[in-house]
Amino acid sequence: TTNGTFTTLYSFYGSSDGGFPYAGVIQAADGNFYGTTGDDGQLGNGTVFKITTNGILTTLHSFAGGSDGSFPSAGLIQASDGNLYGTTAYGGTYNDGTVFQITTNGALTTLISFNGTNGANPQAALVEGTDDNLYGTTQNGGPMDYGVIFRLTVPSLVPTPAFSAPTLLPNGTIALAWSTVAGQTYQLQSVTNLASTNWVNLGSPILANSAVTTTSDVIGSNSQRFYRVVLSTP
């Protein structure tokens, strides 16, 4: 407390609850604290945990050391979508570590497995940029095996593109505009019948540099055409 009162909220046993919490904890929007242990847990590869301000600890995930990763030495972040994101130093498809997403209820998704070429053994926390991407570093890997700085696009963090009203131009084309996030890449697609699932790409992917992106399309002999925009991931 501010007057110097020290209280131990929880002591790890090094068993199913985990052990060696190298990183700190974060307080999420729900008021609880979340963190990782670098070792132990039910499967011996570290854990993600939740702890209340009263010291009640819940293990949200015990890493198995397979595709879910192992030995998370870094802390977590809570991104703007409300989910928690973190890294494991090892495990994953190539045993070079992972980036993972986990809900506050403990549902874990591996977003990427490092393979050495794109980096290896991340041991620091991620940062969510103002562009809604996640940024981080790896200790090893990359062309010279001295580590990399990486950016990871998580589609759920990027707002869904929203079209403005189209404008019919006098030369037989239609002007299209939609909301974008600068730095993200979008692909315009179309179909002539909404019953079809075969959406066709129109032109090359477009790298947005502002909050609104505009382009045009030739209507041609089509009596109707439907458009959509999808976010292109790396």
Sequence positions of predicted segments:
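Short, composition-biased motifs enriched in small/polar/acidic residues
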Residues: V154-P234
